[in-house]
């Protein structure tokens, strides 16, 4: 199978969930991202990968409205992003849980932040906690949970109001390799039940191939789109998928696109 190479937009037939056009972000030290363009389809799980410092996290923050671009525009369902949008959930590398709140209280905090009545979302919070394999830990506090469990609480919190778009910035980066692998399968289960559109950032090629419908490989700083690789593996994916010949081929394609930059 030939992989689509692109420095432009991923074309779609319907309005994209996310559309980025000529996005550039410059700092005093230079451009982190330059003329970046791509699209994410509705209900698609798309992952950004690339060399360290290529602007993956900066891109996510511009799309979320947390950081303004120097040039270019980001759109969510056709609406230009000029401030944080309520229908977008965000998960960071650190779970950022409130230490004085229990698991369910941390999940319900999202409703409070958005001015909603937490009581109306209690059943959804319990359903998400169960889906994330945290049943029985509803009343536990963050210090009583492992790192992986804390991150699952953060994911449940981000999903509480059922955002149509979920942005995830290296959410498993601080976890050990075994916990990280388990979290990948847990996230796949949660996403399969909700089918939110997801834009995910990771340094792990294995994680990217396991989770994604599409992988966007970025160039070294300043970040641009180097390649777009569709992941045509059937779902659900499990531990056997990791040794599947097609999985290995896709992972090699991603790795080759990243490593090619080291010799260019």
Predicted features along the sequence, with ranges:
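The feature captures the beta-strand-to-loop junction immediately N-terminal to the Walker
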Residues: 49-51
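Helix-to-loop junction immediately C-terminal to a conserved catalytic motif
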Residues: 64
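Conserved ABC transporter NBD signature motif
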Residues: 72-84, 124
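Short coil-to-helix segment of the ABC ATPase nucleotide-binding domain corresponding to the Q-loop/switch region
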Residues: 101-108
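Conserved ABC ATPase "signature" region
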Residues: 112, 119-137, 189
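Conserved signature/switch motifs of ABC ATPase nucleotide-binding domains
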Residues: 140-143, 161
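Catalytic Walker B motif of ABC-type/P-loop ATPase nucleotide-binding domains
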Residues: 166-169
């Amino acid at each position: 199978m030939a992989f689509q190479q692109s420095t432009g937009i991923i074309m779609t037939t319907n309005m994209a969930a996310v559309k980025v056009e000529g996005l550039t972000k410059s700092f005093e030290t230079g451009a982190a991202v330059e003329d970046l363009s791509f699209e994410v389809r509705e209900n698609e799980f798309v992952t950004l990968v690339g060399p360290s410092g290529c602007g993956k996290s900066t891109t996510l923050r511009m799309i979320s409205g947390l950081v303004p671009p120097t040039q270019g525009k980001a759109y969510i369902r056709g609406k230009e992003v000029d401030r944080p949008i309520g229908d977008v959930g965000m998960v960071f590398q650190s779970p950022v849980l409130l230490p004085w709140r229990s698991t369910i209280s941390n999940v319900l905090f999202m409703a409070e932040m958005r001015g909603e009545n937490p009581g109306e979302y209690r059943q959804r919070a319990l359903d998400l906690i169960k889906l994330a394999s945290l049943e029985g830990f509803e009343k536990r506090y963050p210090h009583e949970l492992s790192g992986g469990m804390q991150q699952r609480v953060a994911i449940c919190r981000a999903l509480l109001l059922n955002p149509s778009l979920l942005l995830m910035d290296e959410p498993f980066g601080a976890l050990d390799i075994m916990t990280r692998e388990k979290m990948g399968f847990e996230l796949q289960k949660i996403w399969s039940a909700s089918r939110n559109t997801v834009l995910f950032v990771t340094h792990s090629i294995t994680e990217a191939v396991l989770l994604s419908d599409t992988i966007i490989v970025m160039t070294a700083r300043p970040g641009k789109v180097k390649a777009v690789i569709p992941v045509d593996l059937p779902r659900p994916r499990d531990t056997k998928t990791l040794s599947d010949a097609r999985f290995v081929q896709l992972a090699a394609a991603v790795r080759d696109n990243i490593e090619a930059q080291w010799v260019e």
